[in-house]
Amino acid sequence: MKYNNGKVSDVKIAYIGGGSRGWAWTFMTDLAMEPNMSGKISLYDIDQEAAKNNEIIGNMITRRDDTVGKWNYETANTMEAALTGADFVVISILPGTFDEMEADVHMPERLGIYQSVGDTAGPGGMMRALRTIPMFVTIANAIKEYSPKAWVINYTNPMSMCVKTLYHVFPEIKAFGCCHEVFGTQKVLKGIAEQELKIDRIDRNDIHVNVLGINHFTWFNYASYQGIDLFPIYCKYIEDHFEEGFEEKDENWANASFACKHRVKFDLFNEFGLIAAAGDRHLTEFMPSERYLKDKETVADWNFGLTTVEWRKKDLEDRLNKSHRLVSGEEEIKLEPSGEEGILLIKALCGLTRVISNVNIPNTNLQIENLPSTAIVETNAVFERDSIRPIMAGEMPENVVKLTMPHILNHEYIMEAALTFDKSLVVKAFEQDPLVKDMATKEEVEKLVEDMLDATKAYLPKEWNL
């Protein structure tokens, strides 16, 4: 990297999953709008055609007159080629296909177990982790060999398991996980504050929060705007609007069809006194099944949705068609801020600015005092030149710890199961997951695990002997 007049050039970013038809385009547009950084993006993907298409799309963006951040995009034929000389590594992959995810999400429904997302917790999240961990073992070993000093940014779910695997394989890695769910909750607070305080256009970044939890089961125990404590305002809003909830307009591609009225957040606040800081669809999967996911009628009553894999397949088809239009020049990507912070964090790690944002990293410094040091936790951190300094978030209330610990323990079980090919550990994790617990007999759980492993065996190591 070269520095001159407050700018940095010759930055190399390796993008693992560089054929992405969602996050990659968001990444490209944010880079194109940042005038103080430039360099090379090396795109690696097992689908080389998809990576090649993104190379074309990225370079078309670079050639545009309205692009201020100039980057050269190239396709790498191997992970080694992409990683060699990289200053930053971005990981954004789909572990398996939506056919495997169809089994993840819908196979447990035969036992009355419903999942609103199926990529983090619950049977679907754990099965996805078993596919993902071997991939991340390979990626971590490659980073260790070819770019050990690079900063590694993960966007892949299940976030906690991905980051945990990177550190398990390469303890000295400089890796962290980025997730936008906290931003979404800040936007809810922004909207409520604008209504209740009669203020126009509050900037989300002016909503200051203390973040603590694990990914997709994250909480605020502090929220303020220009010295105003937002907790009493949030509490009063819930008292007045619990039944109708809060609706917002969200143009982010990743959230557009995931709308909810945030009534699950409101319900959790009434019980625990903290602001739950993730989408309702994610939050529900960390709670006992009967509370929010008992059946489709209960889901409808709480005003969120079950994201079906059929919808995901249709969405992928739409994005494939969009990719063809972008490559041909029939359509052009709009250059507008995505609301994501990945590029801002890279800019901070380059030393051009200083940023506080939420991050998923090991709890090594006990930034959440009463969670294990081996857990991957989500808290705020300070990003500056070649450094991430986690902010001490304090203690999590014990009643929230009790909800969180089964998932942290399951991370340990699933990690060990993935590395030792131990089916009994998968069964153990399923049995204590709150979506599964009390919903099935041991024999039914064992059969479910057997069938789900069989459905995903194409992406599992042969040592599973399936």
UniProtKB/Swiss-Prot annotation:
Cross-referenced SUPFAM superfamilies: LDH C-terminal domain-like (SSF56327), NAD(P)-binding Rossmann-fold domains (SSF51735)
Cofactor(s) listed: NAD(+); Mn(2+)
Positions bound to substrate: N157
Reactions this protein catalyses: [(1->4)-alpha-D-galacturonosyl](n) + H2O = alpha-D-galacturonate + [(1->4)-alpha-D-galacturonosyl](n-1)
EC id: 3.2.1.67
Entry superkingdom: Bacteria
GO molecular function: galacturan 1,4-alpha-galacturonidase activity; metal ion binding; oxidoreductase activity, acting on the CH-OH group of donors, NAD or NADP as acceptor
Keywords: Carbohydrate metabolism, Glycosidase, Hydrolase, Manganese, Metal-binding, NAD
Pfam families documented for this protein: Glyco_hydro_4, Glyco_hydro_4C
Cofactor binding note of this UniProt entry: Binds 1 Mn(2+) ion per subunit.
Residues annotated to bind Mn(2+): C179, H216
Role description: Alpha-galacturonidase able to catalyze the hydrolysis of the chromogenic substrate p-nitrophenyl-alpha-D-galacturonic acid (pNPalphaGalUA). It is probable that alpha-1,4-di-galacturonate (GalUA(2)) is the naturally occurring substrate.
Subunit structure: Homotetramer.
Record-stated family: Belongs to the glycosyl hydrolase 4 family.
Protein name from the UniProt record: Alpha-galacturonidase
Organism: Lachnoclostridium phytofermentans (strain ATCC 700394 / DSM 18823 / ISDg)
